[in-house]
Amino acid sequence: MASLLMLLTSVAMTAQESNWTLMPKAGMTVSTLAGEDAEYCSNAIGWTAGVDLGRRLSERVELTVGVGFTKNVVKDDIGTSIVSIRVFDEGRMTFEYIDVPIGVNVKLWQGLSASLDVQPSLMTAGKERFFYDEYACDSFEDRVKFMSNPYSDPRTSEYTHFLKRDSEDGGGIRHMSNKLNVSASIGLSYEYRRVTLGARYHFGLTNVMDTDKLPMYSHYPDQSEYDGRHKDKLRYLSLTLGYRIGL
């Protein structure tokens, strides 16, 4: 009995003194693109989830490596484009990645820590959706009259009326994107009773798009020529809630 008690005490002390931790976490992202197309893009909300393995080196310093999934959404402000009886005014690009963040956490004060990470990410999916207002004509004759004028605007034409708000898949984003994206991040976190609230800002180091696969077309509000050389990088803020488990 005494031997069993000593064994249990030894295991408990080892667990308490372990320098290894595991932290599952999940939260939201606020993303945009930085680069030549930044003026046409704005923030949109996505989500992220994953788990970090930590190894404490000292009282203040901890090395971490993790694996996670991030869905970044970017709003594409395409301006107003009239196609027949549809008025396109917004697009949303979605980039989904499996992330492997590698970094260091430094304890600043009590539960407050700062972090610095490098994160390679493998793209798993990508898509683009365009949103539009659709209008309709009451009769075939009205449609002929509306279509006879190439400058007709369905929002003001006497031959049309508003029908619905809808969207369609733009396609091609995954094919035109780099499969590997590398970013760096800086952040702050606060831990209380193993519950950790974290905020990180991620700076893309590589281009989101593969410039060799971009088409030659113009679809921006100023109708500037799209030369296929745009070099945009992903920038996003992640806010997560995690729980630290001692190993």
Task: Annotate each predicted stretch with a short phrase.
Residues M1-K25, L241-L247:
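Bacterial Sec-dependent N-terminal signal peptides
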Residues Q16-R56, L63, G246:
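Short glycine/proline- and aromatic-enriched beta-strand/turn motifs that initiate or cap beta-hairpins
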Residues E17, R56-R60, W109, Y192-V195, ...:
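Outer-membrane beta-barrel channels and translocator barrels
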Residues W20-A26, L63-V65, V100, A114-P120, ...:
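Transmembrane beta-strands of outer-membrane beta-barrel proteins
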Residues G27-T29, G68-T70, Q119-S121, R200-G204, ...:
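Outer-membrane beta-barrel pore domains and translocons
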Residues T29, Y190-R194, K231-L247:
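Outer-membrane beta-barrel "beta-signal"
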Residues T32-A44, N72-E96, M123-S183, T206-Y236:
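Extracellular/periplasm-exposed beta-strand and loop segments of Gram-negative cell-envelope proteins
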Residues D52-G54, G103-N105, G187-E191, G242-R244:
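Transmembrane beta-barrel domains of outer membrane proteins
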